[in-house]
């Protein structure tokens, strides 16, 4: 799932304002976490799919994060495995905060007809102003099977209060054959023990962007998802459940993802 990437998993667990670089500091300057994820999905005309991942996330200090992961996914007759590295660096400039981030996912798989290479890399910048407004610029490059191209994205987020964050974004293909023009919206609600999220996406999209590495007849997407995170202070972790519904030109997919993130080795505390 697109929102279950490593940095997104951490962001779903931490308070939304922290994830966007607002005026907040992690409880521990140096911290280590393990992120475990499993998912299952349905897809008409197939036996569905599923997958799992394990990741290590490390905060070198309050503003520097890095992580590595390995993931395996199956959908219909296709399967693929890849490793990931990611990192982010945040710096203050006057009253603004800027977070630079990058990620790379490299691996291989087989779709039943032939073996294929799996490569997705991305880099981006998030600027936060007035402790409330964030602007995101990102470019994501795809090279999977015969699909390739760049997908720049512009996103705007606004922190209405310490517990409510809204985000809208637009991504459009540049070069290659992605053929993607995607509009998205999301809301995050955070509480003392529970965090909630919900979002929608619609537009033209390549199945590869949805992590569907099989041939599908249509490219018109209507998507909605909801999720909840339960903070587990006594276990120094958090559990997230996300349910995602996708309608890709009449081909309906339902996916359920469970993430568990926990601290180890240091005395950091969940936000």
Task: Label the model's feature ranges.
Residues 21-76:
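Short glycine/proline- and aromatic-enriched beta-strand/turn motifs that initiate or cap beta-hairpins
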Residues 35-37, 55, 86-90, 124-126, ...:
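Outer-membrane beta-barrel architecture
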Residues 36-40, 68-72, 102-106, 123, ...:
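Transmembrane beta-barrel strands of outer-membrane/channel proteins
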Residues 41-50, 73-83, 106-119, 141-150, ...:
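Solvent-exposed loop/turn segments connecting transmembrane beta-strands
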Residues 182-244:
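Outer membrane beta-barrel transmembrane domains
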Residues 187-194, 226, 252-271:
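Outer-membrane beta-barrel "beta-signal"
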């Amino acid at each position: 799932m697109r929102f279950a990437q490593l940095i997104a998993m951490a962001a779903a667990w931490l308070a939304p304002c922290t994830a966007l670089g607002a005026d907040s500091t992690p409880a521990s300057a140096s911290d280590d976490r393990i992120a475990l994820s499993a998912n299952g999905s349905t897809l008409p005309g197939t036996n569905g799919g599923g997958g799992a991942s394990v990741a290590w996330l490390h905060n070198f200090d309050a503003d520097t994060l890095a992580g590595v992961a390995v993931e395996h996914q199956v959908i219909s007759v296709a399967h693929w495995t890849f490793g990931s590295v990611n990192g982010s660096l945040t710096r203050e400039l006057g009253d603004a905060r800027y977070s630079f981030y990058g990620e790379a996912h490299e691996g291989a798989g087989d779709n039943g007809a032939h073996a294929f290479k799996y490569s997705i890399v991305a880099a981006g910048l998030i600027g936060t102003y007035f402790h409330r407004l964030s602007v995101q610029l990102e470019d994501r490059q795809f090279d999977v099977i015969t699909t390739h191209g760049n997908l720049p994205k512009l996103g705007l987020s606004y922190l209405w209060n310490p517990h409510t964050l809204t985000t809208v974004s637009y991504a459009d293909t540049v070069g290659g054959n992605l053929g993607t023009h995607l509009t998205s919206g999301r809301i995050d609600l955070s509480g003392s023990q529970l965090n909630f999220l919900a979002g929608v996406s619609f537009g033209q999209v390549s199945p590869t962007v949805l992590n569907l590495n099989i041939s599908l007849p249509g490219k018109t997407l209507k998507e909605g998802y909801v999720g909840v995170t339960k903070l587990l202070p006594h276990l120094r972790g958090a559990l997230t459940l996300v349910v995602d519904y996708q309608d890709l030109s009449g081909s309906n997919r339902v996916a359920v993802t469970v993430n568990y993130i926990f601290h180890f080795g240091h005395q950091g505390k969940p936000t």
